[in-house]
């Protein structure tokens, strides 16, 4: 009888871990397109980042008036961005809810405390090198 109980507890613990690490992706403004973002694309985004705990803003490209440019899926941004911005159309907007495992983990960075869940409002402005008529 002990083996099934231990197995059940282990299964519940592992299920809890996988749920804790789930990335939330909500499309807030959908767009139809022929060409969506893929791993390796260089993209330009606008974003606003806030802490889930209290809603305080820690960064926003909108405030600077300058989009953020990076290569998607190359590990140059947090894992939540590399995964949460795939299959996106130019003009689409998404809200990403990024748990610590997909963000900055226990270490934090700057105004972001360790263990923080992050909320990013994102907008895809451009997939570099893709002509507008192919979008």
Curated annotation (Swiss-Prot):
Q: Which UniProt keywords apply?
A: Endoplasmic reticulum, Isomerase, Rotamase, Signal
Signal sequence region: 1-20
Q: Which InterPro entries match?
A: FKBP2/11 (IPR044609), PPIase_dom_sf (IPR046357), PPIase_FKBP_dom (IPR001179)
Top class in the EC scheme: isomerase
Q: Where is this motif: Prevents secretion from ER?
A: 132-135
One GO biological process term is: chaperone-mediated protein folding
Q: List the disulfide bonds.
A: none
Provide the E.C. number(s) assigned to this enzyme.
5.2.1.8
* Cross-referenced Pfam families: FKBP_C
Annotated PPIase FKBP-type domain ranges read 40-128
Question: What activates or inhibits this protein?
Answer: Inhibited by both FK506 and rapamycin.
Which catalytic reaction applies to this protein? [protein]-peptidylproline (omega=180) = [protein]-peptidylproline (omega=0)
Keyword Isomerase annotated: yes
Using the UniProt record, give the first listed, main subcellular location.
endoplasmic reticulum
The record ties this protein, via SUPFAM superfamilies, to: FKBP-like
Name the Gene Ontology molecular function terms of this record. Answer: peptidyl-prolyl cis-trans isomerase activity
GO CC annotations, alphabetized: endoplasmic reticulum
Subcellular location, record wording = Endoplasmic reticulum
* Family, as annotated: Belongs to the FKBP-type PPIase family. FKBP2 subfamily.
Q: What does this protein do?
A: PPIases accelerate the folding of proteins. It catalyzes the cis-trans isomerization of proline imidic peptide bonds in oligopeptides.
From the Swiss-Prot or TrEMBL record, give the protein name: FK506-binding protein 2
Q: Which gene encodes it?
A: fkbB
């Amino acid at each position: 009888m002990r083996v099934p109980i231990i197995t059940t507890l282990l299964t519940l613990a592992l299920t809890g871990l996988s749920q804790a690490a789930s990335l939330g992706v909500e499309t807030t403004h959908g767009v139809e397109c022929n060409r969506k973002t893929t791993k390796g694309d260089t993209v330009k985004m606008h974003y606003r980042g806030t802490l889930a705990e209290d809603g305080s803003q820690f960064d926003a490209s909108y405030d600077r008036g300058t989009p953020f440019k990076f290569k998607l899926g190359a590990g140059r941004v947090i894992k939540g961005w590399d995964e949460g911005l795939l299959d996106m159309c130019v003009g689409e907007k998404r809200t990403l809810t990024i748990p610590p495992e997909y963000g900055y983990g226990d270490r934090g960075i700057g105004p972001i405390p360790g263990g923080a869940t992050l909320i990013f409002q994102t907008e895809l402005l451009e997939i570099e090198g893709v002509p507008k008529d192919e979008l």
